[in-house]
């Protein structure tokens, strides 16, 4: 059984999520201890427990230690289900997109539809629009497509969001994406939930003003939703290159001007673009698992502790001939 110290490196939930995914794909059981030991609230929280439960059900796994506050978990996967329609409810504003990341590789070329309820636009996790504008488009470039439907948005602290993942298809091949290439344009989504539409407009306008410094081809659409359980706003932007895609987002909050939200996302995007890496730092972390599975290489703008930790977890399950070169930007290559 693979033994994993959940406190090493970044020491957060990503260690558990990557372990769940790779354990299911390789059919290698694991024991993880010191789960989130470095966090203010150590152990499994509702969001992590939902990820465990989702993978448990999808893989017919045997699990010990799956309760709130648990700092040790033993996970023994079975066979991945071939078809079915499943619903997983976090019950809080915990991130639906982090659970999406965990289970997506398990759904590939299977007749599975998964609905996840919780937060869609919450701090310290990819927004649902980042998944739609950046993550899904990057996966298309390596041969994987999927549908992700945004049914309801969920902001912190109320949650109430809902997404549905289906039709995960593809024949991923070895890939090499090491340059961003010529900038083709910008796309984005500026949203409000149960708030005045002018907030989304102002977020959009302030972002456009900054992005025009590089290119006039900008397509930011508005997503205005009324009657949602949670109130909130945000904007997600992506820069489309000939080879790469760079994303950045920002969330609104009480007392924060809408113009500031748009400027924050746009300035983050321009900063990411300066390195000429194919992908942004968040995508650099998320793509590492796929590069390890399908022998890929890519560059990303900044090597984070998340990425370093993720690579070490991957090596626990897969015997990869991989290397990391540089830091800002960095190259990850698996041969």
UniProtKB/Swiss-Prot annotation:
It is found in: Cytoplasm. Its EC number is 6.5.1.4. The gene is rtcA. Belongs to the RNA 3'-terminal cyclase family. Type 1 subfamily. Catalyzes the conversion of 3'-phosphate to a 2',3'-cyclic phosphodiester at the end of RNA. The mechanism of action of the enzyme occurs in 3 steps: (A) adenylation of the enzyme by ATP; (B) transfer of adenylate to an RNA-N3'P to produce RNA-N3'PP5'A; (C) and attack of the adjacent 2'-hydroxyl on the 3'-phosphorus in the diester linkage to produce the cyclic end product. The biological role of this enzyme is unknown but it is likely to function in some aspects of cellular RNA processing. This is RNA 3'-terminal phosphate cyclase. ATP binds at residues 101, 282-285. HAMAP family: RTC. Keywords: ATP-binding, Cytoplasm, Ligase, Nucleotide-binding. It holds the Pfam family RTC. The active site is at residue 306. GO terms for biological process: RNA processing. One of its GO terms (molecular function) is ATP binding. It catalyses: a 3'-end 3'-phospho-ribonucleotide-RNA + ATP = a 3'-end 2',3'-cyclophospho-ribonucleotide-RNA + AMP + diphosphate. GO terms for cellular component: cytoplasm. NCBIfam families: RNA_3prim_cycl (TIGR03399). PROSITE patterns: RTC.
